[in-house]
Amino acid sequence: MAQLLLIYNGMFSLNKYCFEKETVKMKNVKVILWGLGAMGGGIGKMLTKKKGVDIVGAIDIGDKIGKSLYDVVPGIVRGDREDVIVGTPEEVIKPGAADIVVVCTNSFTKDVYDKLVFVMEKGMNVITSAEEMAYPQAQEPELAKKLDEIAKKNGESVMGTGINPGLIMDLLVILWTAACEEVNHVTSRRVNSLSPFGPAVMEEQGIGISVEEFNERKANGTMAGHVGFAESTMMICDALGWKWDDFGQDMEPIVTDVDRKSPYGFAAAGQVAGVAMKGWVNIDGERKIDMDHPQQIEPEQVGVHTGDYVILDSVPPVNMVNTPEIEGGIGTMAMIMNCIPHCINAAPGLKTMIDIPVPHAIMGDFRDLIDEDKKIVK
């Protein structure tokens, strides 16, 4: 009996050794950051706190080029990591340089398209914070088709995600419908703060402009407001099998009566501090989806309480309330970081949040979530 136990223990130790040896064969997940603003830099800080993942490249513009990543991103900790020097796309994006590139530079598919193509043609997966890329077929079907073709040709995957679109007003709604036999109407409401977001978002939302300028930009189509209603509603419709045909949206300025200052924006009393957006979808003449999304800098300063709400006229009915809101800045960074393994593992092509497994926090080793045959940097 003692001999059998010794043999068993020896086999167990050998198997344990072999298993551990096998698991350490895979190199850390290699990531390149393209764009080191509030979102890209924040994702970098998050990644340095995780196991099994390395930042191996960084891209930006202006005076950041030639400097250390750990000098240009506030609060990021280098520790004993190798230094990463910020460079140009041509200097950093090389074949086989990384498993995935995180692009945080633009909101619109047409503006980020060339960057995504450049990455894929160098043989790497790419994930972006560009809001329209959460479901680009909604407003840029031709570009979406081209991205899918280029990704498949190069054997890589491309996707966009974030807190919204990407989770709160689309994927979360879709997940709740899984408990329903029938769904008659969807209401999604998000009251959130814009304070964590960077200069690009401040510009898109018109923070600090006059009401007159807001109305002028709205009239000539240069006032972006929230980017994502078309993407979120089409994602919901496609998931549920509804025909997305009659879509509309509107916006009104949120005018502050006190001075408000966020890390990247300022609105004096009488100026625009945010945008109240509404969106809707009618199917066969019947309203099926309503979106309500007021967002502004420093809402708490004027007594506005943030929150996320999903209301389904369904069987059974659903009424989800989360207060305060899931914070948009951290939420967007985390969504992108936590989708990195899914993007790497995905079959080649353009992917969306309804094409990949449900994302989740990664508290262990990134390498444990990567399919070995999908790893680029072996």
Task: Label each region the model flagged.
Residues Q3-K122, H342:
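N-terminal glycine-/serine-/threonine-rich beta1-alpha1-beta2 phosphate-ribose binding loop
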Residues W34, A38, T177-Q301, I326, ...:
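Active-site-lining helix/loop region of Rossmann-like oxidoreductase modules
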Residues L167-A178:
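Alpha-helical support elements that line or immediately flank enzyme active sites
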Residues K122-M124, K153-E156:
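A short helix->loop->beta-strand "cap" motif at the edges of active sites that frequently abuts
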Residues I61, N106, M124, A130-A134, ...:
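Short, ordered loop/turn segments at secondary-structure junctions
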Residues E131-G155:
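Rossmann-fold NAD(P)-binding glycine/threonine-rich loop
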Residues L116-E140:
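ADP-ribose/adenylate-binding Rossmann-like module
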Residues S262-K378:
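C-terminal active-site/capping subdomain that shapes the small-molecule cofactor and substrate pocket
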